[in-house]
Amino acid sequence: GIHGSPTAVMAFEGATGWLVGPENRGMASMFTMMNNARLAVGAQGVGLAEAAWQHAMHYAMDRKQGRTPRGPGAIIDHADVRRMLAEARAEIFAARAITLACGLAINLSHATNAPHWEARAALLTPIAKAHATDIGCEVTSLGVQVHGGMGFVEETGAAQFYRDVRITPIYEGTNGIQAMDLVGRKLSDGGESAFRLLQEIEDHAEHAHTTLPTLTGDVWEAAETLRETTEWMLAAEATDRAAGAVPYLRAFARVLGGHYHLRAAMADPSGPRARLARVFVDRILPEHETLCLRARA
């Protein structure tokens, strides 16, 4: 269970209930209250993923087992362990970047009162909460996998990260609710805020093409596929949108992850950021296509 939480059963009996906001608008009012909490839970997912990754990395560098093509050595020299650690690192970077972009949009909306930033913050909030916590669960699970059987030995601490993070896709609105919020309330502007963000992604990919031609094409094409899926969502019946909401949110997060990795790579085209971006674009970003197909199914 979750420790240190004030969650409890409360019996109000004959207490008077007061409406929150106008009649039939209570949910919208509640989401206004929850926005900061949703972003904070996303940050919790990122933090636990980072802690689990560092824990797994140290173990992989220390644990000697088996033989690699280079002879006996630590398990970090095994190809699949290296793959898990590299993909987890790329996932954490993307989830952190989405969370930071959401926080920046919230700050700018407060500082400027500009409708553009208010819309951007609203669009990114459900994505940041849902995706960062999903990635938290996936990366902490990978951390256990890197440890092998030792991951189930309590003293290693690997499983604790997973137990701690598993609540995050549930509270402050389940991730399914976040996805419903995205395809419902956040696309209710006719997709204007989503299309504006996708245009920024495509424009940046075109700008970066001369410097990083092997990365930019994939990012641009992913944004275009998501644009087409967004158009489908806007034209679909409400039940069809709801059925495709979860894969749509994840596809959106994949495209955003590719965009932020590309921006980081542009700041260091021959350094580690560019190599990490290559991992994401080659191994993780392609998921967006299947996710978009599932969203439209």
Give short role names for the model-derived ranges.
Residues 1-225:
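Internal glycine-rich alpha/beta core junctions
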Residues 189, 200-297:
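C-terminal amphipathic alpha-helical interaction region
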